[in-house]
Amino acid sequence: MTEIVKVREQLQISLSDFQEQASLQSGQIFVVGCSTSEVLGERIGTSGTMEVAEAIFSELKQFQEQTGIELAFQCCEHLNRALVVERELAMKYQFEIVTVTPVRSAGGALATYAYHNLKDPVVIEFIKADAGMDIGDTFIGMHLKHVAVPVRTSVKEIGSAHVTMATTRGKLIGGARAVYAAKEETITCR
């Protein structure tokens, strides 16, 4: 089995396991950070390839078609971990669009591939995503809503890259007397 085929297979299993647990809904935002260098077993930022980026992008687009989620592709630290998204998403949520074109050496291979293969791509600096996937320890946490909840899948690596995934939940607020699940005794005034 070639490395690319293995990467595709691992990604499919990981996304399927994730969706089974997280149950993402249509319209929710899914952020992806990825080091294609790490996927190939190299140090982050040193050996990114468009071939690996294409394989990962196509699997993520397939996941998007199946679930109706919106994708956000995190750039590397050279672009302050900005994100490539469809213009329609940026306009819908009034995300501020910034001017930069990701390239493999300043943006990363996956974000660059996304920028050249989305319908109408733009780059934004900030987002609060509902869930996400981190391939190669790229640190997507800054782009997740509070509170992040880790999701464990059967896949621990994509290629040679460590993979983590998370969904989010609303904050539990209110202190000692707060109630988080409605029960008969909590909805009556006796």
UniProtKB/Swiss-Prot annotation:
Coiled coil: none annotated. NCBIfam families: TIGR01440 family protein (TIGR01440). Signal peptide: none annotated. It comes from the Bacteria. HAMAP family: UPF0340. SUPFAM superfamilies: TTHA0583/YokD-like. Belongs to the UPF0340 family. It holds the Pfam family DUF436. It comes from Bacillus anthracis. This is UPF0340 protein BA_5559/GBAA_5559/BAS5166.
